Swiss-Prot record:
Protein name, per record: Zinc finger protein-like 1 homolog
Main location: membrane
GO MF term list: zinc ion binding
Organism in which the protein naturally occurs: Dictyostelium discoideum (Social amoeba)
Cited InterPro entries: ZFPL1, Znf_RING, Znf_RING/FYVE/PHD
This protein's UniProt keywords: Membrane, Metal-binding, Transmembrane, Transmembrane helix, Zinc, Zinc-finger
Length: 354
């Protein structure tokens, strides 16, 4: 499910332009494009140029009348559809004629209202097989529109009195105030009115005069709308002053939602710095774990290196001590040998002299 450029949700996807489209935009901007569901595009995005489903011929890009797209989005030449329909059984109804490729009907149903459905009706309105059916549809549609207009715009030329059923002119018409003048000049009072309605069917009920403003205040405005207008203006001013901030907040909020929806499927420029920052934010726990593990390994290596250096120092010290002991022993042994030889020589010399 995606969003078309006109903000409508749609599952249809244009393979040529690689974007979501609705049944309204397909008529204006994608008249001969290859269109299928978005799931089909995800499955296989390869497509060929659109050709007629009956004659397999290509369409003229510059001629919009050269092709017609049905509600199932299959494309045909209008002449090929006419030939295809002529070969169908005559006992079948016009609205049930199926598409040459699928069981969907060629003509849209009466309750289907869209730009695509209207374009199909306009295209086949000149065909002999669909002309009568489409004319009856247009006639029925025009009658329903007239009935809706009559219901929405009732004729109200006056107000009916709920007491005696007499018809009263609109209070804003000049005739209303003319009748008021005549009633006051005839001496009719508000509180002494009797129900003598047979002779006064066309005269306003005098009890209504209590709600009408005096004529002396209508010199500047004969319709008596000035005071009411000012009251409404004061009300509007108070409403605007009290709700100005709320309205502005709602407008900004709606614009924000609109911008988010509009930019949802648009490509944004890639900023390397912001991309790196976003990646760091997304992978922050991973980086913390990696940094912690690296610090622990570093401390372990340092401790092992320190212990190895201490053991090496001890070994070197022992070797030096052994060497010193050996040298001392050698020195001692060498001195004793020299003394013994001298003593021996001293002893031998006298013996030789004898």
């Amino acid at each position: 499910m995606g969003i078309c450029k006109c903000k409508k949700r749609s599952e249809d996807f244009c393979f040529n332009h690689k974007k979501f489209i609705c049944d309204s935009c397909v008529v204006a901007d994608h008249s001969i494009c290859y269109i299928k569901s978005y799931v089909s595009w995800l499955t296989d995005c390869e497509f060929e140029d659109s050709v007629c489903g009956v004659c397999k011929g290509k369409f003229d890009v510059d001629d919009n009348d050269d092709s017609v797209r049905l509600l199932c989005y299959h494309l045909y030449h209008p002449e090929c559809i006419d030939v295809y329909v002529a070969a169908l059984p005559q006992n079948s109804s016009v609205e049930s004629y199926p598409c040459p490729k699928c069981p969907e009907p060629i003509l849209p149903s009466n309750d289907k209202q869209s730009l695509l459905a209207n374009s199909i009706r306009d295209r086949f309105s000149v065909s002999s097989w669909a002309g009568d059916y489409l004319k009856s549809f247009k006639k029925q549609n025009s009658n329903s529109n007239n009935n809706n207009n009559d219901n929405n715009n009732p004729k109200s030329n006056g107000i009916t009195n709920g007491i005696n059923g007499t018809h009263i002119n609109n209070a804003t018409s000049p005739e209303f105030y003319t009748n008021l003048d005549s009633i006051k000049s005839n001496g009719i009072h508000h509180h002494h009115h009797h129900s003598n309605n047979s002779n006064n069917n066309n005269i306003i009920n005098p009890s209504l005069l209590e709600e009408t403003p005096p004529l002396s205040h209508l010199n500047s405005n004969p319709y008596g709308l000035a005071s009411r207008k000012h009251e409404h203006e004061d009300t509007v001013i108070q409403l605007n002053s009290g709700t100005n901030s709320n309205i502005s907040n709602n407008i900004h909020g709606n614009n924000k939602i609109y911008d988010d929806d509009y930019d949802k499927y648009n490509k944004r420029p890639v900023n390397p710095i912001s991309k790196i920052i976003n990646n760091i934010k997304e992978t922050k726990p991973k980086y913390l774990i990696m940094i912690t593990v690296a610090i622990i390994v570093f401390l372990i290596l340092i401790s092992k290196m320190g212990s190895n250096s201490d053991s090496n120092d001890n070994i070197v010290g022992d070797n030096n001590n052994n060497n010193n002991n050996i040298n001392i022993n050698n020195d001692n042994n060498g001195g004793n040998g020299a003394i013994n030889e001298e003593t021996l020589n001293d002893q031998k010399i006298p013996n030789n002299g004898q």
